[in-house]
Amino acid sequence: MQDPNADTEWNDILRKKGILPPKESLKELEEEAEEEQRILQQSVVKTYEDMTLEELEDHEDEFNEEDERAIEMYRRRRLAEWKATKLKNKFGEVLEISGKDYVQEVTKAGEGLWVILHLYKQGIPLCALINQHLSGLARKFPDVKFIKAISTTCIPNYPDRNLPTIFVYLEGDIKAQFIGPLVFGGMNLTRDELEWKLSESGAIMTDLEENPKKPIEDVLLSSVRRSVLMKRDSDSEGD
C-alpha cells in the first residue's frame, strides 16, 4: 500500500483533487513537536514544583539540561521560603541579655523586626510575674523578639522604683515604653492584659477582641452597685 504522506507526483494529484488531505509542511510538524515538548515540559515542571527539597534531590538524575535549569529555580525558591519560615519562627522564648549585647540584639535586631525588652531585677515580685507572662507571649508570638535584662546591666544606676520597665522597639527605634508598677496595675496584672497593652504599641497582633482590663470607672460602678444591693438585702432582713 502506498504511503499517503510520501512525496510523490501521484499523491500530489490526489491532494489537489481533495482525495488526500494536504501534506503538513515541515515547519508545521516542527511547531507541533515544539508544542508537545512545551506541554510535556510544563507537566514536568508542575510535577517537580510540588516536590520537597529532599524529593528534588532524589529525582535529579531524571532531569535533562532544561529540566535542571527549571528545577534549580524552584529549588532556590523553596530554599528561600524555608529560610524565611525559619527566620519567622526562630524565637518563641524570652532571651536573656546584658548591656554588652544591647546593640546587637536590639539596635541591629533586623529590618521589620519588633523587639520587646523587659528591664527587671531579682526579688521584685511584679518583675517575676511579667517574666512569666512574657514567656507565654513569646511562645504565642514567635515572630516577635522578646528579651529581658537586669536593669543596671543596660542602664547604670537605673532606679528600682522604675521597675518593671518594658521598652518596645522597631528597627532600633523606641515605639512604646511602660515604666513602673502603676502602669501595669500591680500584681493583679494578667497575661491577657499585658498582651493587650503590648498590642496597642503595634508590636503584636492580638486575637483578643476587647481590653480584658475594665476601665476604672466600670470597676467603681460595679463596686457601688454591689454595695447598694448588699444594703437593700440588709434593710429587707431588718424589716
UniProtKB/Swiss-Prot annotation:
Function noted in UniProt: Acts as a chaperone for the angiogenic VEGF receptor KDR/VEGFR2, increasing its abundance by inhibiting its ubiquitination and degradation. Inhibits the folding activity of the chaperonin-containing T-complex (CCT) which leads to inhibition of cytoskeletal actin folding. Acts as a chaperone during heat shock alongside HSP90 and HSP40/70 chaperone complexes. Modulates the activation of caspases during apoptosis.
N-acetylmethionine PTM positions: M1
GO CC aspect terms: cytoplasm; cytosol; endoplasmic reticulum; nucleoplasm; perinuclear region of cytoplasm; perinucleolar compartment; protein-containing complex
Gene for this chain: PDCL3
Keyword Acetylation recorded: yes
UniProt PTM: N-terminal methionine acetylation destabilizes the protein.
Region (Interaction with XIAP): 97-99, 153-155
GO biological process, any: negative regulation of chaperone-mediated protein folding
The protein's assembly and partners: Interacts (via thioredoxin fold region) with KDR/VEGFR2 (via juxtamembrane domain). Forms ternary complexes with the chaperonin CCT complex and actin substrate, leading to inhibition of actin folding. Interacts with XIAP (via BIR 3 and RING domain). Interacts with HSP90AA1 and HSP90AB1.
Molecular functions (GO terms): protein folding chaperone; vascular endothelial growth factor receptor 2 binding
Assigned protein family: Belongs to the phosducin family.
Protein name as it appears in the record: Phosducin-like protein 3
UniProt modified residues of type Phosphoserine: S43, S234, S236
